[in-house]
From Swiss-Prot:
Protein name: Small ribosomal subunit protein uS2
Family: Belongs to the universal ribosomal protein uS2 family.
Gene Ontology MF: a single term: structural constituent of ribosome
Listed Low complexity bias regions: 23-32
HAMAP family: Ribosomal_uS2_A
Single GO BP term: translation
Gene: rps2
Length: 249
């Protein structure tokens, strides 16, 4: 899949895999990058005035105030060239603001994509503490599989490992924290959907969902929307509310 620079709804990120990794991956894991204690979430600017999207007429899945209240738009103080097109502006405190209309659009696109897969062949991962419960709830809602916490090397690449699985698509909470899962997905040739913040590299990601991927409320909202939209495209009635994705946090 390759990215269409016209930024149409169906655009996908170009998958540029590295060389195939050996089955015996390094045991150095992302726990060092994603400590159990997550950073405090920055305080949003006034939700009545904050400019968070380029398309002010966009028909969003939820009110823009709900995105703001969850901090979905709050990026980091760093940005990559890969994520530049998803950034709307920079705040006075130096934080980059993600374009909420692009987030909303990419949730829909990801749901369209996932609805084509057997639910049990979808794997979602999260090494980040605040992403674990929402990721597990997403898997429960759509019938997917979840591997949260430390991703064991060989899960996708070593048939001799007891926990070996063969999913058809991978959803990750953070390409940095979930780098082992992404690396193995590239090795076995399955597409990767990733929640990406302003500081993420996306060269190994097939479909970016731009969002604050460090805040617990932001991840709850995005995973909840993705679950509901995926179910909707299958013709199933969503039965989970946002509270269900936040109860375990």
């Amino acid at each position: 899949m390759s990215e269409n620079e016209s930024d149409t709804e169906a655009e996908l990120e170009e998958n540029a895999p590295d060389e195939a990794a050996a089955d015996a991956e390094s045991t150095a894991q992302t726990d060092e990058q994603t400590p159990d204690t997550e950073a405090d979430e920055p305080a949003p600017e006034s939700t009545a005035t904050e400019d968070v999207m380029s398309d002010e007429e966009a028909d969003l899945l939820i009110p823009v105030e709900d995105y703001l209240g969850a901090g979905v738009h709050i990026g980091t103080q760093q940005k990559t060239n890969d994520m530049d097109r998803f950034i709307h502006r920079v705040r006075t405190d130096g934080l980059y603001v993600l374009d909420v209309s692009r987030t909303d659009d990419r949730v829909r696109t990801a749901a369209d994509f996932l609805a084509n897969y057997d639910p049990e062949q979808i794997l979602v991962t999260s090494s980040r503490q605040y992403g674990r419960f929402p990721a597990e709830k997403f898997a429960e809602a759509v019938g997917a599989r979840a591997r949260t916490g430390r991703f064991i090397p060989g899960t996708l690449t070593n048939p001799d490992y007891d926990g070996y699985i063969e999913p058809d698509v991978l959803v990750v909470t953070d390409p940095i924290g979930d780098s082992q899962a992404v690396k193995e997905a590239i090795t076995v040739g399955i597409p990767v959907i990733a929640m990406c913040d302003s500081n993420n590299q996306t060269g190994n990601v097939d479909l970016v969902v731009p969002t604050n991927n460090k805040g617990r409320r932001a991840l709850s909202v995005v995973y909840w929307l993705l679950a509901n939209e995926t179910l909707d495209r299958r013709g199933a009635e969503p039965t989970y509310g946002l509270d269900d994705f936040e109860d375990g946090l």
